[in-house]
Amino acid sequence: MNQHLLSAAQIIQEGGVVAYPTESVYGLGCDPFNRNAVMQLLAIKHRPVSKGLILIGESLAQLAPYLHLNEQQSAQLEKKWPAPITYLVDASDRLPAWVRGEHRKVAVRVPDHPLARQLCQLAGQPIISTSANISGRPAARNRYQVARQLGNQLDFIVSGACDRAAKPSTIIDLESGRILRP
């Protein structure tokens, strides 16, 4: 197993904030159930808690305890993931309010990037995923851009490549099918 990822997963479990590659850009991640870690991540980004955050997992099974899904919705997600598609799904009461922000739904994804999925697997739970940048600035696409913009505020940066041609993930409301970000 990749020692680099093991270190990042341990830092997440200990309440740290890490940067890691996803399909399109580098993401920032932490333990979604650790309020202090999430608040630290939001402070790094200069992002208000009210906006909510994306939760990624290694599989739908890892995300399911925090979601309200019927069988049809579960089957739909199983067919679509892993992929750079984020769905807005009704959140269960097990998901902290600081992850959802002002919303009753939570944004969730099973990424189509092996390092991001492995990081969730090694952390043993879903993790936060938000672009590695200060809000309003361009998202970082490599570890050097992450280090230049956020380096001394992060506990760890995972090495890896993003797809240079990829766009940020599509966002779809699972219930209505409405595309919120193409």
UniProtKB/Swiss-Prot annotation:
It is an enzyme of class 2 (transferase). It is found in: Cytoplasm. GO terms for biological process: regulation of translational fidelity; tRNA threonylcarbamoyladenosine modification. Residues 2-182 form the YrdC-like domain. It catalyses: L-threonine + hydrogencarbonate + ATP = L-threonylcarbamoyladenylate + diphosphate + H2O. Its EC number is 2.7.7.87. SUPFAM superfamilies: YrdC/RibB. One of its GO terms (molecular function) is L-threonylcarbamoyladenylate synthase. Keywords: ATP-binding, Cytoplasm, Nucleotide-binding, Nucleotidyltransferase, Transferase, tRNA processing. InterPro entries: DHBP_synth_RibB-like_a/b_dom, Sua5-like_dom, TC-AMP_synthase, TC-AMP_synthase_SUA5. One of its GO terms (cellular component) is cytoplasm. The keyword Aminoacyl-tRNA synthetase does not apply. It comes from the Bacteria. PROSITE patterns: YRDC (PS51163). Required for the formation of a threonylcarbamoyl group on adenosine at position 37 (t(6)A37) in tRNAs that read codons beginning with adenine. Catalyzes the conversion of L-threonine, HCO(3)(-)/CO(2) and ATP to give threonylcarbamoyl-AMP (TC-AMP) as the acyladenylate intermediate, with the release of diphosphate. Belongs to the SUA5 family. TsaC subfamily. NCBIfam families: L-threonylcarbamoyladenylate synthase. This is Threonylcarbamoyl-AMP synthase. It comes from Alcanivorax borkumensis (strain ATCC 700651 / DSM 11573 / NCIMB 13689 / SK2).
